Swiss-Prot record:
All residue ranges annotated as the BACK domain in the record: 152-254
Disruption phenotype: Mice display pseudohypoaldosteronism type II (PHA2)-like phenotype, such as salt-sensitive hypertension. In kidney, increased level of Wnk1 and Wnk4 kinases is observed, while Wnk1 and Wnk4 levels are unchanged in other tissues.
Function per UniProt: Substrate-specific adapter of a BCR (BTB-CUL3-RBX1) E3 ubiquitin ligase complex that acts as a regulator of ion transport in the distal nephron. The BCR(KLHL3) complex acts by mediating ubiquitination and degradation of WNK1 and WNK4, two activators of Na-Cl cotransporter SLC12A3/NCC in distal convoluted tubule cells of kidney, thereby regulating NaCl reabsorption. The BCR(KLHL3) complex also mediates ubiquitination of CLDN8, a tight-junction protein required for paracellular chloride transport in the kidney, leading to its degradation.
GO biological process annotation, one example: protein K48-linked ubiquitination
Kelch repeat windows: 302-347, 348-394, 396-441, 442-490, 491-537, 539-585
Organism classification: Eukaryota, Metazoa, Chordata, Craniata, Vertebrata
Sequence ranges assigned to domain BTB in this UniProt record: 50-117
Region (Disordered): 1-24
Name of this protein: Kelch-like protein 3
Post-translational modification as stated in the protein's UniProt record: Phosphorylation at Ser-433 by PKA or PKC decreases the interaction with WNK1 and WNK4, leading to inhibit their degradation by the BCR(KLHL3) complex. Phosphorylated at Ser-433 by PKC in response to angiotensin II signaling, decreasing ability to promote degradation of WNK1 and WNK4, leading to activation of Na-Cl cotransporter SLC12A3/NCC. Phosphorylation at Ser-433 is increased by insulin. Dephosphorylated at Ser-433 by calcineurin PPP3CA, promoting degradation of WNK1 and WNK4.
Family to which this protein belongs: Belongs to the KLHL3 family.
Phosphoserine, modified sites: 376, 433
Main location: cytoplasm
Subunit structure: Homodimer. Component of the BCR(KLHL3) E3 ubiquitin ligase complex, at least composed of CUL3 and KLHL3 and RBX1. Interacts with CLDN8.
Length: 587
C-alpha cells in the first residue's frame, strides 16, 4: 500500500540453496554422446549432411565440419579462421598419407584406433599435425611398451624428432639401464660420435664393470674402422679406466692395438695405472670424471623359475617380484623341459638341454623378458640333462650331465655373438647332477654323480679359461649330488643335495682365497635338485624335492646373520629340477 515501506526479500542461506538443489533433479545420460557420435558416423558413411571433403594423396574422406572442429584444434582453426579453407568444399592435407588420414578421421567419429608396429611411425606425426593429442599419447605409450635393447636408440631418435619429451626420456633411461645389451646391437654401432659420447659419459649407465664401456668403444670403432679411427681418443676420454681391475688394464687394455697406436689413449692408460699404485686414501683425493664411479638407477629385479618336474616335465615358468612379494605366470617354454641348465646372459634367460619327459635333449630356448617370449637358438653338440650351466667371459658353459646312458665329463661353450657351440677341455671326472658357479674368473664344478663308482661325489674341480684346464680343488666335507650351487660375495655355496637316499639340509661354503670349505647354517628343509640364485646380498634356494615330494617353497640365506628364512609365498606348484635366473623387471 501507498506509504508503506517494502522490505527486501531475505537472502537464501547456503543451507536453503542446498535444499533447493536437492529438490531439483539433473539427469546425465552417460550414453548420450556416444549415441550421438554413432549416428553422426552413420550419416557420414551414407554421405548425408557432409559439408567438406578432406583429401590426402588419392584418398578422399567426406565429413562434417562441426565434428572435425569439435575434436581437432587443427580443423577448428581452419574452419573458423579467415583462411580460404574455411569456406572450401574440398581441402587437401599435405604431409599425411591417405590411409593414415582416413584412420584419424575414423577416430574422430568413433574414438577407436589401433596402434601397431607397422603404423605407429606415420600415425604419431599425423596425429601431431591434426592436434589429436590422445592419439599422439597412445602412440607414445605404445612405443614405450615396445622398448627393447635392439630398438630403444631408434625410438629415442624418433621421439627427439617429434618432440615427444617423456618418450625421449624413457628411451634414453632404457638405453642407459640396458647398456650391456644395447651395445651389442646394430643401432648402437650406427650412432654418431656425439651420440656415443653422450651415452657412455652418463653417470647413470648401468654396467657391472667399466669393461663393458671399453668393449663398446672398441666395437664401435671397429665397425667402421677407417672412418672412425681418429675418434678413439675422444671416446676413451669417457671410459673410466682407473675403475677397471689392474689385471684387465694390463692383459686387455694395454694389449689393444687401438690403444697402442694412440698417444692420448696411452696417457689415459698411464693415468689409470698410476691410480692403482696410490694408497686408497690418496685415490679418494683425485677428482676427475674418469675416477668417479657411475651411479646407475637400480632397476627392480625379478626371479624366473623355468620348467622342472611337477612330477613330470612341465612347460610352466613362474616369476617372483621381489618388490611386490608375489608370483606370476609368464610365457611358457615352447616344450616340456626339466633338469636343464638355466642362466642369464646378455639380457636374456637361456634354458639349456634337459629332459622333455621322454628324451634327453640338446636344444636351447631363450627368453626375452621385454617381449615375454621364448625363441630357439643353436643346439648343443651333445644331449645333456642334469647338467650345470654358468656364464664366464660372455660365454655360456654347459658342464657334464647325463646323455641317457652315461654321465658326461665333456664341457661345451656357447657364444651368443656367433650362435655357435664348441667343446672345451673335459673335466677329470664324469659328473651328472652337478652344480656349477663362477668365482673370480674361474668355473667350478661341484659334486654330482659319476655313474661309474655308483657313488655321489664330494670332489670339486676348477676350470681356468686362460689355460683351458681343469684342476681339483678342496673336497666338500660331504658327498653331494643334486646340490644347489650359487655364488654370493665371491664365495661358492653348496646347498643340500643327497648322498644315496639321504637328502641333506646342510650347507657349506668355499673360499677360493684359502681353498677351504666351511659349514654354515642348515636350511629349514631338506632339498635336492633345487634352483639357486643370489639377489641383493641374499642367496635364494628354490623348490627341489625332499626325497618324497616336490617342494613349492623358497628360502633365502643371509650371510650377515647366518640364518635361513622361508619366503611367505610359495610357487603355484612344487618343482624339482627347475632352473632359476634373475632378470631386470620390465619397465
Amino acid at each position: 500500500m501507498e506509504g508503506e515501506s517494502v522490505k527486501p526479500s531475505p537472502q537464501p542461506t547456503a543451507q536453503a540453496e542446498d535444499e533447493e538443489k536437492n529438490r531439483r533433479t539433473v539427469t546425465v545420460n552417460a550414453a548420450h554422446m556416444g549415441k550421438a557420435f554413432k549416428v553422426m558416423n552413420e550419416l557420414r558413411s551414407k554421405r548425408l549432411l557432409c559439408d567438406v571433403m578432406i583429401v590426402a594423396e588419392d584418398v578422399e574422406v567426406e565429413a562434417h565440419r562441426v565434428v572435425l572442429a569439435a575434436c581437432s584444434p587443427y580443423f577448428c582453426a581452419m574452419f573458423t579462421g579467415d583462411m580460404s579453407e574455411s569456406k572450401a568444399k574440398k581441402i587437401e592435407i599435405k604431409d599425411v598419407d591417405g590411409q593414415t588420414l582416413s584412420k584419424l578421421i575414423d577416430y574422430i567419429y568413433t574414438a577407436e584406433i589401433e596402434v601397431t608396429e607397422e603404423n605407429v611411425q606415420v600415425l604419431l606425426p599425423a596425429a601431431s599435425l591434426l592436434q589429436l593429442m590422445d592419439v599422439r599419447q597412445n602412440c607414445c605409450d605404445f612405443l614405450q611398451s615396445q622398448l627393447h635393447p635392439t630398438n630403444c636408440l631408434g625410438i629415442r631418435a624418433f621421439a627427439d624428432v617429434h618432440t615427444c619429451t617423456d618418450l625421449l626420456q624413457q628411451a634414453n633411461a632404457y638405453a642407459e639401464q640396458h647398456f650391456p645389451e644395447v651395445m651389442l646391437g646394430e643401432e648402437f654401432l650406427s650412432l654418431s660420435l656425439d651420440q656415443v659420447c653422450s651415452l657412455i659419459s652418463s653417470d647413470k649407465l648401468t654396467v657391472s664393470s667399466e669393461e663393458k664401456v671399453f668393449e663398446a668403444v672398441i666395437s664401435w670403432i671397429n665397425y667402421e674402422k677407417e672412418t672412425r679411427l681418429d675418434h678413439m681418443a675422444k671416446l676413451m676420454e669417457h671410459v673410466r679406466l682407473p675403475l677397471l681391475p689392474r689385471d684387465y688394464l694390463v692383459q686387455t687394455v694395454e694389449e689393444e692395438a687401438l690403444i697402442k697406436n694412440n698417444n692420448t689413449c696411452k696417457d689415459f692408460l698411464i693415468e689409470a695405472m698410476k691410480y692403482h699404485l696410490l694408497p686408497l686414501d690418496q685415490r679418494l683425493l683425485i677428482k676427475n670424471p674418469r675416477t668417479k664411479p657411475r651411479t646407475p638407477v637400480s632397476l627392480p629385479k625379478v626371479m624366473i623359475v623355468v620348467g622342472g618336474q611337477a612330477p613330470k616335465a612341465i612347460r610352466s615358468v613362474e616369476c617372483y617380484d621381489f618388490e611386490e612379494g608375489r608370483w606370476d605366470q609368464i610365457a611358457e617354454l615352447p616344450s616340456r623341459r626339466c633338469r636343464a641348465g638355466v642362466v642369464f646372459m646378455a639380457g636374456h634367460v637361456y634354458a639349456v638341454g634337459g629332459f622333455n619327459g621322454s628324451l634327453r635333449v640338446r636344444t636351447v630356448d631363450v627368453y626375452d623378458g621385454v617381449k615375454d617370449q621364448w625363441t630357439s637358438i643353436a643346439s648343443m653338440q651333445e644331449r645333456r640333462s642334469t647338467l650345470g650351466a654358468a656364464v664366464l667371459n660372455d660365454l655360456l658353459y654347459a658342464v657334464g650331465g647325463f646323455d641317457g646312458s652315461t654321465g658326461l665329463a665333456s664341457v661345451e661353450a656357447y657364444s651368443y655373438k656367433t650362435n655357435e657351440w664348441f667343446f672345451v677341455a673335459p673335466m677329470n671326472t664324469r659328473r651328472s647332477s652337478v652344480g656349477v658357479g663362477v668365482v673370480e674368473g674361474k668355473l667350478y664344478a661341484v659334486g654330482g654323480y659319476d655313474g661309474a663308482s655308483r657313488q655321489c661325489l664330494s670332489t670339486v674341480e676348477q676350470y681356468n679359461p686362460a689355460t683351458n684346464e681343469w684342476i681339483y680343488v678342496a673336497d666338500m666335507s660331504t658327498r653331494r649330488s643334486g646340490a644347489g650351487v650359487g655364488v654370493l660375495s665371491g664365495q661358492l655355496y653348496a646347498t643340500g643335495g643327497h648322498d644315496g637316499p639321504l637328502v641333506r639340509k646342510s650347507v657349506e661354503v668355499y673360499d677360493p682365497g684359502t681353498n677351504t670349505w666351511k659349514q654354515v647354517a642348515d636350511m629349514n628343509m631338506c632339498r635336492r635338485n633345487a634352483g639357486v640364485c643370489a639377489v641383493n646380498g641374499l642367496l635364494y634356494v628354490v623348490g627341489g624335492d625332499d626325497g618324497s615330494c616336490n617342494l613349492a617353497s623358497v628360502e633365502y640365506y643371509n650371510p650377515v646373520t647366518d640364518k635361513w628364512t622361508l619366503l611367505p609365498t610359495n610357487m603355484s606348484t612344487g618343482r624339482s629340477y627347475a632352473g632359476v635366473a634373475v632378470i631386470h623387471k620390465s619397465l
